[in-house]
Each structure stands twice: as C-alpha cells, then as structure tokens.
Amino acid sequence: MATINDIGVAAAINIVTAFAFLLAFAIFRIQPVNDRVYFPKWYLKGLRSSSIQTGGFGSKFINLDFRSYIRFLNWMPEALKMPEPELVDHAGLDSVVYLRIYLLGLKIFFPIACVAFTTMVPVNWTNKGLDRLRHSNISFSDIDKLSLSNIPNGSPRFWVHLCMAYAITFWTCFILKREYQNIALMRLQFLANDQRRPNQFTVLVRNIPADPHESICELVEHFFKVNHPDHYLTFQAVHDATKLSELVLTRKQMQNLLDYNINKHMRNLSNRPVIKMGFLGCCGEEADGIKYYTSVVEGLTREISEEKQRLRTGTKSIVPAAFVSFKSRWGAAVCAQTQQTRNPTEWLTEWAAEPRDIYYDNLALPYVDLKIRRLIVGVAYFFLTFFFMIPIAFVQSLANIEGIEKAFPFLKPLIEVKLLKSIIQGFLPGIALKIFLLFLPRILMQMSKFEGFVSTSSLERRAATRFYMFQFINVFLGSIVTGTAFQQLNSFLNQSANDIPKTIGVSIPMKATFFITYIMVDGWAGVAGEILRLKPLIIYHLKNSFLVRTEKDREEATDPGTIGFNTGEPQIQLYFLLGLVYAAVSPILLPFILVFFGLAFVVYRHQVINVYNQKYESAGKFWPDVHRRVVTALVVSQLLLMGLLSTKHASKSTPLLLVLPLLTIGFHKHCKNRYQPAFVTYPLQQEAMIKDTLDRIREPNLNLKAFLRDAYAHPEFRVGEDPEPEEKLESDMSPPDLVATKRWSWRNTPLPSKDSCREIP
C-alpha cells in the first residue's frame, strides 16, 4: 500500500504536471496563432476577429509584446471577475448552475475539513491500535494512523466519530437545502425574464395512434382542434429525413471545395484551377475545378429540393410524433401536464425541448420499442459493470504491492527499487484507472441514444446517471472490495472466517491512500490539462496546415466543446462521495478534494466564459439529479460508518447512527416536494398567465403562428430556404366552429359524417 513517501512522490509528480500545464496554457493563450483555440466563444459571438489576417508576419503568429508575458497569470482574476448575472446572460443558466456544483463542494467540505483536522486527526493519531496489530499480518503504513483504523476496538473515542457524523449530516443538509432553494429561484427568474422562445408554446406529442381514415397530419389537427379548441394554434409534423441529411452534408462538402477553387482562382486570375477526376484526385482526366464543383453543387441542390418536396407531400416519411404549438404558454402548460386520453400509452405529451436540443433521430421510435430497447440496455449495462471489475482488480493490484510481496515473494526483487516502487504505488494506480475509464462515457452515451431519449439534455442526464452508478459500483465499492482483498491477502489466508469482518473494518479506511492518488491524477493534473486543451490545439493546427482551404474551414477547425454534463458531473459526484465517506473515517483525504474543487472552479469558469459553447439551454433542469446524488453519498457514508463501528465493537455509539439515514431520507423527501416542482412543471398562474398577459400588452399584433411556423422543422428543411410571408394574426385567433374530419361513420353506412370534408384547410 502507499506510504507517506509514495504519496509525496505522487503529489510532486502531479503538482509539477499541473503547474506545467497551467504555465503552458498561460503562454499559449496569448499567441495569436492559438487565438481560435482558447477564445472560440468570442468568435462565435462575433466579438473577436482573426489576428492572422492582420499585422506583420511575425505578429500574425507570435505575441511580440513582452509585457503580456509578465501578466500571463491574469486569466485567473479575469475568470473570477465576471458577476454571476452577467455570466448567465453570456453563457446561460446551465453553465452557471454547473459551476455552482464546485462552489457547493467548497461550501460543504471547507468547514468539515477545518473541524476534522482539529478534532478527528488528533483523536486518530494519538492511539496505538495499528501498532498492536503488527503481529497479525495486517498491512498498513504510517499514514493509516490518521484514520479510524488506528483506534482500538471498543474505545470510547468512537463517540467523537459519532458526533462528527451528526455534524457532517446537519451541515451538508443545511447547505444542500439553501443551494436547492437558490437555484430553484434562479430557474424561475430565468424563465420569467427569458425572451419569447418556441419551446414555451410547444408540446411534443408521441405515440400518435394509427387511424384508417386519416393521415398523421389530419389526425393531429383534428385531435387538438377538438380537445383544445381555444388554445391550439398549429403543429409541425416529424419526418424521417435521413436521406435529406446525407444530401445536405454532401452539398456542404462540395460547396466548400467550390469556394476553395474560386478563392484559388481569385489569387491568380491567369490560371483556372484544374482537378483530376480519378482516385482521390491523384489521377484520371483533368477538369476545370470551378465548373465541375459548380455543376455538382447545382445537381445536389436540385436533389435536395426534390427530396424536400417528396417529404412534404408524401405520408410514408411522417412518423407518429408531432410538435404541437398553442396560442399561449398557459395552453401549452395545460396540455403538457395532463393526460390526453383514457389510454395512457397514446397521445403522450411533454414539454418540447428547445429546437437545438431536439435529438431528431429518436423521434420515430415506437412506444413499444422504447421498453424493449431499455431492457436491452439494462442487461448490457449490467454485464459492462460486472466485467469492468477485472481492470479494477488489476488497478488495485498495483496499489498494494506489499500485500502481493507477502503472498508472492518471488516478485519482490523486481519491484523493490525505492523510487520505482513509490511511482508504482503512488502514481500508476490513479493513471491506470483514468485510462480504463477513458472510453466509458462514449459507450454510455451510445446506450442512452439507443434507449430512445428525444433531447440532447435528457441523453446527457441519462448517461450521467449511468456513469455515476458505474463509478459508485466499480470505482468506489469495487476498489474497496478488491483493494482490501489484495491488501490483506496474506491475512485472509491465515485467519479464520470469523476474523475476516474485523480485518475488513480495519483495512477499508486505509483505502484513502488509493483514492488520494486518483484525486491527484484526475482532479489536479486532469483539470489543469482541461484548460490547456492540448488535443483541440493539435487538431486545430493539423487542420489549419493541411485541410483548411477557406475561412469557413478555419471557423470549423476548432470545436469549442461544452461543459460535458454526462462526464463532468459524475466525476464531481465521486469526489462528493469520497469526501463524505472519508470525512469521519480518514480526514487526510479532504485537503486533496478541496484543492480539486478550488482549482476546477477557476478553470471551468474560465472555460465557460471563453471556450465552451452550449448546445442547448435547459435552465438548470439537472439540479435535482445533483441534489439526489449528494444525498445518496451522505446516506452511504452513514451506513459505511455504521458498519465500520460495528466491526470495531463500538456497541454503545453505533445504534445512535441508525437515525441519521432516516433523517437524511426525510430531508430529501422534503426538498423534493418543496423545490423539485420548479424543475418539472410550469406554474400556470404566476409564470404562464403573467407572461401571456405581458405579451398581449406589449405586442398586441404579434403574429405567433409565423414565429412558430418552422421552429421545429427538421434542421435540414431550414437549410437554404427563404422565409414565407407572414400571415394575419386574426386568422390564427379564430378557430372554426366545426372541426373538419375525414373519419367515416361506423354505423354500417357508406356516407361520411356530416362534419367531414375532402381537405382540411
């Protein structure tokens, strides 16, 4: 197991690595050639222009102002300078709420760390429990004397740990409640102050039943004119536009090549650009590049127009789902929050996500398929979690060399070199675990897409939930179980089964050393590596050197990325779990967690301001998940402490811990009932009706139908289209007295019903 020297070596490696990353970033960011990599958000907002096109040859690529190198650390205060309301306007509420997770960690753990180091550390260190176990084949190091393992069985000092558990619980619940309340208020204010957006008036309707007499479009029109006659406005059918998407992508590529050849010709008017028609443009007949790509683009444009017309006029491409818009937010809220028919599996309604958040590929999935898909994903996830225990066991074998040496003495000469041993135990386990987890988020995101979620935000929240469960089962519990097995392997082999729980109770607190190494690799060096953006930097310069032909290519060469809720939030929750579990067991871990939260807050605030470009805005809808996982970590810490004290024969203090999980669960239910509705439902009176009234006063002649007409059309339908002329408002606000329908009578008569007509207007 890792000793103090091993932890010191690991800390030195990670501190040097993090400092090198931060120093490299501070220098790279001020170079004009890297401007698009480190400030892409300002380019997207149109507030920054490329410096490569201006200035002398040297100043295009290298910053020649030596005074800027003196101020190279100014990015830290600049990242903290922007006030929160301005940050909401600049980056959105999702980004601000995400940053508040790091602040939540600082608010919870800083006071806990202060109390733990003034009370828990002296109580643990001044005992001799581990010294008395030297004869029992239990492996430990001096750093483990700071943990609960150093207290002998039945000691009255366990009352201090009991009091600490109560203090941690009450303080954490207090901070969680206050933060939940503040963020719920921020969300409601954001929605109240938000400008008019299509998703405020629109509901997604799924699982529309088939009808032998009417098409999907006619059925939707008929259903909502009948059931919501005073509020229904219009609808947007959902098409399977796979072929259209492929055509649009191909035309975009060909248009880019055409622009490149035109620019090439403009630089040298005497020569027309020539291309070869053979394999990869390396052989074959020669042709005029401009004429060739012009004809290709024109042909693809005709194909796209024909495909759009086919999708609009045909019915086979329409899927049983639609975006239904209403004349008011109140009408949309009523529809989204009520059951439409007796059959709860038909005409399913929910608030539509904003247009850029919609994941169109999953809208066509039938309701029955969703159940089957989720069952398949559940089984696949179980086996993925189960088989991942193998690399976890391998990582733990690296972290417990002493235990392996005792069980397998022939390996001792290979790993006894002092520096090598410190690196293996203090640094290698953390980096190995980080590597094994590298591709997991992509796998979990593909699982979420297969499950059928219809918005990017719901996909990320689902993937985050699975990633958190995976981290809890494999990284936390798996590391403890397999690590304890390797660490105390010799002890297990030479003691009776009745003594194994006692050995586990002693060794679990000692696993803090492994998690310390992981926190330093992932939370220190990893966060510093995030701000350096080494991968996007390399990709940008490779594209800029070999693939960029036009200014549009240069704009697309850098992906600004997003906050990555599906990967970042579960990682943060692992630190909450480790901090709450080990606060009363082995407080030595807390300073490492505090460094992570502090560094990550500064780094990600800088990234949110200058780099990340969110793909959607959910107004902090993910916060209930954050709250629930912190509460889960708190309950796990209480149960684990209860189990540890029971193995230490603290019979008088242990029963008093039984009340803590009950109080915590009751607290969670209170917060769920009090604050979660703000993240799930839309208040009809205070929010919907007030905003509708203000709209009618401020813009009495608003043409809402024109505003919503193509808001939820498939993105490829909106490419290269001219806006249609606006219609009069009066036509939108006066529904017909009779609802047109093509449904035939069911009473054995060939005549249509009296309200039927040949075509719905």
From Swiss-Prot:
At the top level, the lineage of the source is Eukaryota
Q: Name one GO cellular component term.
A: membrane
In this record, what's one Pfam family?
RSN1_7TM
Q: What is its main location?
A: membrane
Show the stretches that span the lipid bilayer: 7-27, 101-121, 156-176, 375-395, 419-439, 467-487, 512-532, 583-603, 630-650, 653-673
* GO MF terms, alphabetically ordered: calcium-activated cation channel activity
Q: Which keywords label this protein?
A: Calcium, Ion channel, Ion transport, Membrane, Transmembrane, Transmembrane helix, Transport
Has UniProt tagged this entry with the keyword Calcium?
yes
**Does Kinase show up as a keyword for this record?**
no
Renumbered residue ranges of the record's region Disordered: 718-761
Query: What InterPro entries does the entry give?
Result: Csc1-like, CSC1/OSCA1-like_7TM, CSC1/OSCA1-like_cyt, Csc1/OSCA1-like_N
Q: Where in the cell is it found?
A: Membrane
User: Where does the record place Basic and acidic residues bias?
Assistant: 718-731
Q: How does it sit in the membrane?
A: Multi-pass membrane protein
- Family note: Belongs to the CSC1 (TC 1.A.17) family.
| Role, per record | Acts as an osmosensitive calcium-permeable cation channel.
Record protein name field:
Hyperosmolality-gated Ca2+ permeable channel 1.6
State the organism of origin. Arabidopsis thaliana
